[in-house]
Structures are given as C-alpha cells and as structure tokens.
C-alpha cells in the first residue's frame, strides 16, 4: 500500500549501514522505511518519540520543543516526543493538519529484551496507521459529524464517457454505502458526502482531468493498482464479511464492488489485524436524493457558513437534537434531501406525531438525553480501543431502549417510522444489560489499564487478589509510621514511581542522618535530588514484590473480565447498532417536532406535481436572528406553480433596491423546499412543493484567485452549470446575473439566461436583478412573472418594507443605500447629479423597443452569399448528435474534437 506523504518524512540522506547506528536507531530506520509517508510515533517508555524530519514537522505543527538525540552521518538527529497519556490530543492536531501517523508500540517489556541478550532492543512494531478517514477515538472525532473514508473507482461506460463508483465508510459507526454516478455528477456527489479522506488509484491520482477536482478535497491518498483490482474485488469483500458468496451482500455493479473492495482493503490495512465490523454495503439508487452542486451548498450555507462556521448555518438553526447520533443523522438528511415522495411522507408523519403529542415528545427527549453514542462505543470496543465507560454506555443504551419503548407504546396510532424504530429497540438482549450492570462498578476509569472497573463481589478470585494487594499497601503505611519513629524524621515518606519502585524519601537536611551509623545499616542510598534524598531497605523490597504480584494479578483478572464482556458486546453488534440508529431516528423526528412547535412551522405538502406554492414563507435562519434582536420577520408568498393551461413552472423576475431583501427571499424559498424534502416542517403558513430533483443557487460570488478566476468568471461558470443541467423538475435561484461586467454586456447575458430558463430548461426559477429593463420580457414570455420588493420614500429617505408584491421596480435606490452606508455628502450629491443626466437619456426606452424587435433566441441572419451546409456535412451532424458533453472529461472532449475534424471533407 502506498500512502501519499503530506510532507517529506524520511531522513535527508540515504539510510546508513547497520554498523553506523545504534541498535535502537537501526530498528527505527527499518520500521520507518516500511511506512513511508507517515509520521512515525516510536514508543520509548512513557513517550512516543519522533526523529529526523518527522520530528521537525511535529515540533512545528504541535508547538513542542525540538531537541536532538545522537548523530546520524555526522549530523545531530532532530528529536521530539509526546507523553503517551496525552497522545490523543497531539494525534488530533496532527490529523487536523493533514498528516498521517504510524503508531509503533513496544511489543515486550525491557526485562524480556534483556533476557534475550544485553544488546537486544525491545521488540517494536506498528500496530495502527492513523489517517483522517479511519478514526475511532472520541477524542479524535467530531461527535456531531460523520467521519467518512471514500473510495473512487472509474471505468469507461459502454455509451461513451466515464462512470464513477463511490464507496464510503464510517468505521466509527459501521455505515457502508455504495453508488455510481457520471463524471459530471461527481463534484456534487462528493460535496454531499463530504468525506474526510478519499482513496484513489495511482492512475486516477495522476490523471490531469481529475487534478482540479482532487485539489478541492481535504485529503487524498493514492494507492497501488492492486487495491482497485476489479478481478479480486468480490473475493476481498467476501473475505472481509466472512461470507461465501456476494449473495449475502447487497446487489452491486462490478464497478461499485471495485470501489467497495478498495475501501475495506484500506480499512483492513490501516487497522492492522483489528478488523472493525461494518454493516453490509447499502446501495444508493441514482436519483434517490436531490442533486445539489458544491456552489449551491456553499451559497445556501446548509451545514457551514461561507466563513466555514457551523454557527449561522441552516443546520445550526434547525438542530434541536439531544444526541450526537441524532445530530449526525440530521446533517446527513440535510445534505441529501429525498426525492421519494412516500419516504418523505413517512418522515413527516413521524414529526407530526410528536408535534401533536407534546407530552410524548418531551418524555422521549428526556430519555434520549441519557442515551449514549452506542455506535461509536461499539466501534471502539470492536477494535480494542474501548474502555469500561463504553461498556457502561451500551448497558445504559439498552436500559434507555426499555424506557423509550414503554413511552412509545402509549401512542394511540404510531406512524410507520416510529413503529420501525420500536422494533429495532426491542432487538438488544436485556440479559446483556443485566450482565453489564452486575459486572461494572459505579465509578469507572477511562482506560481499562487503570483497573478498578469490576464491581466488588462480581468475581471472587478478583476480590481475593485485590484484598492481598490492598493489605500489602496497609503494610507500607505501617512501615512508614515505624520508620518515622525509628529515625525521628517526621517528614519521612514512602513513595513510588515507575523507575525506582517503592522508596523512602526525606528532605535534604535529613539525608546525612540516614547515611550515618547506625541508620545506614537499614537505609540504602538510591538517589539524591535538589531537595530530597531517596533510600530503600531490604524489607521494602520484599513488600514491593508482594504488592507488584498482587496488583498484577488483580489487573490481569480485571482485563480478562473486560475482554470477555467486550467480546459478548461485539457479538451482539448488529442488534446494538439497530437500536442506536432507532434512537437517532427518534431524536431527529422529536427534535424537528420541537423546532416546528417553537418556531411555528407547518407541515408541507410534497407531491409529484410541478407546483410550488408557499404562503407566509420565512427564512429559517434570518428569522431566528431577528427574533433574538427583538425584531419581526416579514413573511412573503411565492407561487411558481404552472398557470392555467401551462405545463411548466413559472419564473419570477424580482426587482427592487439593494438591502430590500431580494437575496433573503430567494434563499428562503430554496431552503423551504429543501427542508420539506428532508421530511421537516417548514417556516410558512402553507407550503405545497412539487418534488424537486435538482436545486441550483447562484447567489453571491467572490474571486477564486487560486484558480485564476475573477468574480465575474466564477459567476459565469456557476450560471453555465445551471443552464446546462437544470431539468423541468429543478428549482433555480439566480441573483444579479451579469452584474460583474459592462452594463450592456451584463444586461444581454441576463436577458439570454432568462430566455433559456423559460424555453429550454422550463424549470421553476427565481431571478433577482437590477436590470429593470428585463421586466418588459413578461410581455413575450408567458411564464415570466414580475415581482418587486416594496419600499417607501419618506422625506428623502428610503424605508425598506421587505414585502414582495406583483409588479416591477422603477428604481434601485442605490444612491439612498450609499448614503445609509456613510458615503461623504459631496459624493452622494454628485452621484445624484450624474444619475439625473443618465436618466434623461432614457436608455430604458431603447431596451423596451428591443423586446418588441427581437424574437426569442434570435441570431444574426446568414450573409447573403453564405451557402447552406453541403450534403457531405451530414456525417458530422450525426457524430455531433451522438456526443454527450456533460458526461465528457476535458480530454475526452478534445479527442472528440479531433475526431470531428478528421471527418471534414478534404478541400
């Protein structure tokens, strides 16, 4: 397996011969060479140490001291280290910075190494590769977000172009999903899934056609071809899931199986012998979710604001969940609204049940508050990284399932989704909960190695070992009292550390007393520090051996108990995961009901029509912000439904001044539609939505300097995507198209875009503009409706009323807005003067005349001497018709162009 290094991590020069380095450094270099591209955490006692450039990288990233240890080819070896006890914090920061880490542990204690020979080095080996997509520890994960590893596999489709298969896994929750898409759909699909790490073949990684897309992803790992070998894919999947044939798994295409096998192979290799259980891959049908491209997701601020913050996003505004799993599920649904009308209705039924029965909703939410994150606790236990608190969490989860079932059983007629959740909650064994309850103590340590987690009385043999250990400690306390009396040193203490074991410690001023006769016959000097002197005695050594043996035996017995309980829990994994998912579903339904009640949302109607009728619509995020400020939100209606005798939805052309609320109105209608299709009530008094298959938004733009694109270029690229891809079932919102260039250029582009939306796309759309001349198009385009945002002038000032009404604005009030922004009075006065002169030219009348003169999609006529295409052009025309530009990569398009040129008649 090849892992792409984020930065160089190997020693600068070639590896030295064994004779030129210490045995420890020889071992380090061998392990490092076997794990290229990863920072090597090399265990040295209570620390993980890093060397060479790994140390320099870690020191810089973590802000820890860079020191040195020994020399390598005449130069000092850079070194830094982190305590094992705090390593999770450092690992989290390294992974967040884009690095990958190989954890190398000591596989034996130093005593065992000494028995093998005085020059033997402690055996070490890499036990795990930590990458962004393969995390399980709660300290490394965001509790409210999934952590997906995604594999991409590509193949040429029989109809031309490429097909892409995607397989994504969250090993912390066992989720495993596969799907296929076209090259043109890949960016939108990746934006929806939002993977933390993407694995691709070396060939795909080096493909220039994929370079731009891969650069946008947070972490991309290229792997060798064998990982993406379709010929061995089914065998590898069957091996991972321990099944004889693929019949036991979901039906998958050959390409999907290739991606799925790559994903599980990578998981297997990074976990090194600790194979995490996964759910069988679930196949996501094409078109089952609303397509939303990356630009639209960003513009609408669905899960993150444009500044990258969760606060201020739609997810933040609607998330009332009580559990981490519920929050993750809500984020998944928001990223992938459904197109299945029946499934949407089932979700709405569940929300409605909790909306109408507030007592049941509040009781369920109270129970859910105590429910642990069962999926992630189970995942940690399955790979040997769990602790006693994970076992207790699963025990508490089963008990919470009983309380939840008891409360839901009181519902008179629970809807289908709630009934399904109840069935899942019945699956875990109550006997398992009883066993865990009997085994675990009240106060549990975080780590199993700390011991003390088994309840007294659960295991008699353990109780005996603990008594012997604890009695020995009482002997130490009595010994300290006796030594204090014998020496007359009241500050004498018996202490313990991992280096010296048990020792007698006195302050420096009493050190000479214990080293002088007659006390020096009893007290043997061990260590002198700045303020203390340490001694041992033969009696203390004997007691230490007894305590160590008793303590080791007690801990060993406890670890056996833990491993036995963990194995039973992992065996019941499928039932526990089903219950965990049921908790998440109930949490989302109850939280959306709470949201609907608190914010006065209503149940939307979602059907198969092309209707779009919203009454009293509000922006879910802006309304809450205004409410916190003590201000009301002005609700507005929007109706894009086909008119009488029409078969396609309407386009609203929205005009009005800056700051009047046009962009808010556009966004709120898109968000209402999206919320309806995730199965949520919506901020409106009434809403009827004909199912939307694609959502497009071009609202706001900024320079993309990294890719050499101006604001206007970004705007045009996003607009091109919309005009090329929007279907009749799409909803499009466009704001200020054409504003980033010369006035007449921009007006012409906006004009042509409206015509295209009306005649070619035939979709439902909201189009905001300051080109008031475009309102005259409503006379030519029957499905174009003019709307404006109402304002009022009062004593020379403009008052924004935020009401959307039929009609067209005659002014943009730009100068008044500039005055409100604080432009100097002289600039405002001059602007008014210039505006008056420009308006006197009555440019608008010229444009209105063009509306009458230009037919739709008119193009300049051919020159009089231009002849019609010759008959031999027919093959070219047929070849052009066979092309599908949206499914072609740039390279494929170029090859097609050369092929067409070759078909031209020779002169």
From Swiss-Prot:
The protein's matches in Pfam families, at most eight in alphabetical order, are given as: MutS_I, MutS_II, MutS_III, MutS_IV, MutS_V
The family database entries (InterPro entries) matched by this protein are listed as: DNA_mismatch_repair_MutS, DNA_mismatch_repair_MutS-lik_N, DNA_mismatch_repair_MutS/MSH, DNA_mismatch_repair_MutS_C, DNA_mismatch_repair_MutS_clamp, DNA_mismatch_repair_MutS_core, DNA_mismatch_repair_MutS_N, DNA_mismatch_repair_MutS_sf
Top-level taxon: Bacteria
SUPFAM superfamilies named in the record: DNA repair protein MutS, domain I (SSF55271), DNA repair protein MutS, domain II (SSF53150), DNA repair protein MutS, domain III (SSF48334), P-loop containing nucleoside triphosphate hydrolases (SSF52540)
Keyword tRNA processing in annotation: no
Family as reported in the entry's similarity comment = Belongs to the DNA mismatch repair MutS family.
Presence of keyword ATP-binding = yes
A single GO CC term, please?
A: cytosol
Name the UniProt record assigns to this protein: DNA mismatch repair protein MutS
Q: Which PROSITE patterns match?
A: DNA_MISMATCH_REPAIR_2
Q: Which Gene Ontology BP terms does the record give?
A: mismatch repair
Q: What does this protein do?
A: This protein is involved in the repair of mismatches in DNA. It is possible that it carries out the mismatch recognition step. This protein has a weak ATPase activity.
Give residues annotated as binding ATP.
656-663
Single GO MF annotation: ATP-dependent DNA damage sensor activity
Q: Which UniProt keywords are present, listed alphabetically?
A: ATP-binding, DNA damage, DNA repair, DNA-binding, Nucleotide-binding
Source lineage: Bacteria, Pseudomonadati, Pseudomonadota, Alphaproteobacteria, Hyphomicrobiales
The organism named in the record is Nitrobacter hamburgensis (strain DSM 10229 / NCIMB 13809 / X14)
């Amino acid at each position: 397996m090849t892992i792409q290094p984020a930065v160089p991590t190997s020693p600068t020069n070639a590896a030295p011969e064994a004779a030129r380095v210490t045995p420890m450094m020889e071992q380090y270099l061998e392990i490092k060479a076997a794990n290229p591209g990863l920072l090597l955490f090399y265990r040295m006692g209570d620390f993980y140490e890093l060397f060479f450039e790994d140390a320099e990288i870690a020191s810089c990233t973590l802000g820890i001291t860079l020191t040195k240890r020994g020399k390598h080819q005449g130069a000092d070896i850079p070194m830094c280290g982190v305590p094992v006890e705090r390593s999770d914090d450092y690992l989290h920061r390294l992974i967040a910075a884009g690095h990958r880490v190989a954890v190398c542990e000591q596989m034996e204690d130093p005593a065992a190494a000494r028995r093998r020979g005085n020059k033997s080095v402690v055996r070490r080996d890499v036990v795990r590769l930590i990458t962004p997509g393969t995390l399980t520890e709660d300290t490394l994960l965001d509790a409210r977000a999934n952590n997906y590893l995604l594999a991409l596999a590509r193949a040429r489709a029989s109809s031309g172009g490429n097909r892409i298969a995607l397989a994504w896994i969250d090993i912390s929750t066992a989720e495993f999903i596969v799907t296929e898409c076209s090259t043109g759909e890949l960016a939108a699909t990746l934006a929806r899934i939002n993977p933390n790490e993407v694995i691709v073949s070396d060939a795909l990684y080096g493909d220039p056609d994929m370079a731009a897309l891969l650069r946008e992803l947070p972490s991309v790992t290229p792997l060798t071809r064998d990982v993406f070998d379709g010929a061995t894919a089914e065998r590898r999947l069957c091996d991972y899931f321990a099944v004889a044939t693929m019949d036991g798994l979901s039906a998958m295409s050959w390409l999907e199986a290739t991606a799925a096998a790559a994903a599980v192979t990578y998981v297997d290799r990074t976990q090194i012998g600790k194979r995490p259980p996964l759910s069988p891959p679930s196949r996501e049908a094409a078109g089952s979710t609303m397509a939303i491209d990356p630009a639209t997701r960003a513009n609408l601020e669905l899960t993150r604001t444009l500044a990258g913050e969760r606060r201020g996003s739609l997810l933040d505004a609607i998330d009332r969940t009580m559990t981490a799993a519920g929050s993750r599920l809500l984020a998944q649904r928001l990223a992938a609204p459904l197109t299945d009308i029946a499934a949407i209705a089932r979700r709405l039924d569940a929300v409605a049940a909790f909306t109408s029965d507030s007592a049941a909703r509040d009781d369920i939410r109270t129970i859910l508050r105590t429910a642990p994150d069962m999926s992630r606790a189970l995942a940690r236990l399955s790979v040997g990284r769990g602790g006693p608190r994970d076992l207790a969490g699963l025990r508490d989860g089963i008990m919470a399932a009983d309380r939840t079932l008891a409360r839901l059983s009181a519902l008179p007629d629970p809807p289908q989704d709630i009934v399904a959740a109840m069935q899942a909650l019945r699956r875990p064994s109550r006997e398992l909960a009883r066993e865990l309850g009997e085994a675990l103590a009240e106060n549990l340590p975080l780590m199993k190695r700390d011991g003390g987690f088994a309840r007294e009385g659960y295991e008699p043999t353990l109780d005996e070992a603990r008594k012997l250990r604890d009695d020995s400690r009482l002997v130490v306390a009595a010994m300290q009292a006796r030594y204090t009396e014998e020496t007359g040193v009241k500050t004498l203490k018996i202490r313990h550390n991992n280096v010296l074991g048990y020792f007698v410690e006195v302050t420096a001023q009493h050190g000479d007393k214990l080293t002088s006769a007659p006390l020096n016959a009893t007290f043997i000097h061990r260590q002198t520090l700045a303020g203390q002197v340490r001694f041992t005695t033969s009696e203390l050594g004997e007691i230490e051996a007894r305590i160590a043996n008793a303590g080791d035996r007690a801990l060993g017995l406890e670890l056996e108990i833990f491993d036995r309980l963990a194995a039973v829990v992992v065996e019941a994994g499928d039932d526990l995961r089903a219950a965990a998912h049921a908790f998440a579903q109930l949490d989302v339904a109850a939280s959306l009901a709470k949201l609907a009640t608190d914010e006065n949302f209503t149940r939307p109607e979602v059907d198969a029509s092309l209707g779009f009728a919203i009454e009293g619509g509000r922006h879910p995020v802006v309304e809450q912000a205004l409410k916190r400020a003590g201000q009301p939100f002005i609700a507005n209606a929007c109706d894009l439904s086909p008119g009488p005798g029409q078969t396609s939805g309407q386009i609203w052309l929205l005009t009005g001044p800056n700051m009047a609320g046009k962009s808010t109105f556009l966004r709120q209608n898109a968000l209402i539609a999206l919320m309806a299709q995730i199965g949520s009530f919506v901020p409106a008094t009434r809403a009827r939505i004909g199912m939307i298959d694609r959502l497009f938004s071009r609202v706001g733009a900024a320079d993309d300097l990294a890719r050499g694109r101006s604001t206007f270029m970004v705007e045009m690229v996003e607009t091109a995507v919309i005009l090329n891809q929007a279907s009749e079932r799409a909803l499009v919102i466009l704001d200020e198209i054409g504003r980033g260039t010369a006035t007449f250029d921009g007006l012409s582009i906006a004009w042509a875009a409206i015509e295209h939306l009306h005649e070619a796309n035939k979709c439902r759309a909201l189009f905001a503009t300051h080109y008031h001349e475009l309102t005259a198009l409503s006379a030519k385009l029957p499905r174009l409706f003019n709307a404006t945002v109402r304002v009022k002038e009062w004593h020379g000032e403009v008052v924004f009323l935020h009401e959307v009404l039929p009609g067209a604005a005659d002014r943009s009030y730009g100068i008044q807005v500039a005055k409100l922004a604080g432009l100097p009075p002289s600039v405002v006065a001059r602007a008014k003067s210039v505006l008056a002169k420009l308006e006197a030219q009555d440019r608008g009348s010229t444009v209105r005349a063009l509306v009458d003169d230009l037919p739709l999609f008119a193009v300049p006529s051919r020159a009089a001497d231009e002849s019609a295409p010759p008959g031999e052009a027919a093959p070219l025309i047929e070849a052009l018709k066979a092309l599908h530009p949206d499914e072609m990569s740039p390279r494929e398009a170029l090859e097609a162009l050369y092929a067409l040129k070759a078909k031209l008649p020779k002169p």
